[in-house]
Amino acid sequence: MTQKTILNDTHRALGAKMVDFGGWDMPIHYGSQIDEHHQVRRDAGMFDVSHMTVVDLHGVRVREFLRYLLANSVDKLKVSGKALYTCMLNPQGGVIDDLIVYFMQEEFFRLVVNAATRDKDLQWIGEQAARFEVRVKERADFAMIAVQGPNARSKVIDLLDPADASAASKLGRFAALQTRTRDGVALFLARTGYTGEDGFEIVLPQADAVAFWNALLAHGVAPAGLGARDTLRLEAGMNLYGQDMDDNVTPYEAALAWTITLDEGRDFIGRSVLESQKAQGAPRQMIGVVMDEKGVLRHGQKVLSAGGEGEILSGTFSPTLGKAIAFARVPAGSIDDLRVDIRGKQVPLRAVKFPFVRDGQAQPGVLGA
């Protein structure tokens, strides 16, 4: 049965076009995906991300457990509220999921994992947690709203209890704090996001979500759907689980080397495979590509390179750039002479560094000569 977030009726009242996303009935747009994309790049937009799964971990050995479970090192998390982006791997080094882990207290960490991988993640985390005597608690009582864009933070801070406004305005990137609204609603406010823009991802009780959403709306934050969320995150060079990596792809093959910490003396699941790939090189690489000819790049299209065949992963038309952009996975080595097969026609591609867009502007080289 399709699941609904607490904001489902609110989306429908706003005229949202609803689609099935990983078993959830979610808004793809509220009239114009392109307008919503530009709204986030230029001002502020908000997304219902209540389909994401919040998992609280409690126990004396919870840090030790996460040192074993995750490819990035939670030893970097020393201050309450600090967050870390990481992959959770299987023994073959494949990505079970990518997630954010928050350090709350020494015996309490919080994970935010993807919606489509919820069942798999909870089973895997539960299996691994047992021998560390860590309690795993899914927080189905929470909703989550992401407010993103250059004016997002100031619009959210205006709605907070004035006593908390200063701390919220000083909150660093990839950090979170417990705060409350002017009406006394408890918020877990994280300076994170999936758009390449500044902003907050806000976890709050489901019972308060509709009123908070409406308060944001009244304060000039426009609703945005999953369509804009996808084009924004791809412009920002951010991976989507299931398209850009999965259980059969290692972080080195998904341009996620920066999320791996091969620190001394820490044995984590999948480490031996990663050490081998680091020493010998991964057989495949993920690159950013731009198509200067008209058309759209789509997941699964065949890519030809000097090193052999690959495929398009995430692909879209970039509203900011006015061109088709994508991630592609191709054999390691040369990325010269790139072409994509579109209905039997070979169309040239340019390999570029990503993010494609930063601070609302094309990155150097992305638009070509």
UniProtKB/Swiss-Prot annotation:
GO terms for molecular function: aminomethyltransferase activity; transaminase activity. Disulfide bonds: none annotated. It comes from Xanthomonas campestris pv. campestris (strain ATCC 33913 / DSM 3586 / NCPPB 528 / LMG 568 / P 25). InterPro entries: GCS_T (IPR006223), GCS_T_bac (IPR022903), GCST_C (IPR013977), GCV_T_N (IPR006222), GcvT/YgfZ/DmdA (IPR028896), GcvT/YgfZ_C (IPR029043), TrmE/GcvT_dom1 (IPR027266). GO terms for cellular component: cytosol; glycine cleavage complex. The gene is gcvT. Belongs to the GcvT family. Its EC number is 2.1.2.10. This is Aminomethyltransferase. One of its GO terms (biological process) is glycine decarboxylation via glycine cleavage system. The glycine cleavage system is composed of four proteins: P, T, L and H. The keyword Transferase applies. It catalyses: N(6)-[(R)-S(8)-aminomethyldihydrolipoyl]-L-lysyl-[protein] + (6S)-5,6,7,8-tetrahydrofolate = N(6)-[(R)-dihydrolipoyl]-L-lysyl-[protein] + (6R)-5,10-methylene-5,6,7,8-tetrahydrofolate + NH4(+). Pfam families: GCV_T (PF01571), GCV_T_C (PF08669). Keywords: Aminotransferase, Transferase. The glycine cleavage system catalyzes the degradation of glycine. It is an enzyme of class 2 (transferase).
